[in-house]
Amino acid sequence: MGFTEKQEALVNSSSQLFKQNPSNYSVLFYTIILQKAPTAKAMFSFLKDSAGVVDSPKLGAHAEKVFGMVRDSAVQLRATGEVVLDGKDGSIHIQKGVLDPHFVVVKEALLKTIKEASGDKWSEELSAAWEVAYDGLATAIKAA
């Protein structure tokens, strides 16, 4: 079964909730990542020299890019059944040493952040839609 119109709509609508408070949700996202994988801090240029996760334009921009890429993945999965990226997105992850366990940590942080942003709109169906979209993105990044 392919990615459904309803799944795409769930990802799109909840990504808009993230955009309502990107500073707060960006800090939450990276805080969760670093709680699970403290060594990942060195992979993010905007975090590696900081004492902790502090809101900054670069942090916010990167978080918005990540969430936007997952949203775009949902659109691609619905339209074509696969996610296709330009080579840059995959190569930077290889260059930074991103491994499978890192993708798991980011997925968990992404889901927890969207759950927080969604509030009472959160559901297992919403979670599953984000999981499938993220998994499609992760697969494309690893293949790039």
From Swiss-Prot:
Root nodules. Residues 2-144 form the Globin domain. The modification Nitrated tyrosine is found at Y25, Y30, Y134. GO terms for molecular function: heme binding; metal ion binding; oxygen binding; oxygen carrier activity. GO terms for biological process: nodulation; response to abscisic acid. O2 binds at H62. Heme b binds at S45, K65, H93, K96. The keyword GTP-binding does not apply. Nitrated in effective nodules and particularly in hypoxic conditions; this mechanism may play a protective role in the symbiosis by buffering toxic peroxynitrite NO(2)(-). Nitration level decrease during nodule senescence. Phosphorylation at Ser-45 disrupts the molecular environment of its porphyrin ring oxygen binding pocket, thus leading to a reduced oxygen consumption and to the delivery of oxygen O(2) to symbiosomes. It is found in: Cytoplasm, Cytosol; Nucleus. Leghemoglobin that reversibly binds oxygen O(2) through a pentacoordinated heme iron. In root nodules, facilitates the diffusion of oxygen to the bacteroids while preventing the bacterial nitrogenase from being inactivated by buffering dioxygen, nitric oxide and carbon monoxide, and promoting the formation of reactive oxygen species (ROS, e.g. H(2)O(2)). This role is essential for symbiotic nitrogen fixation (SNF). Monomer. This is Leghemoglobin-1. The gene is LBI.
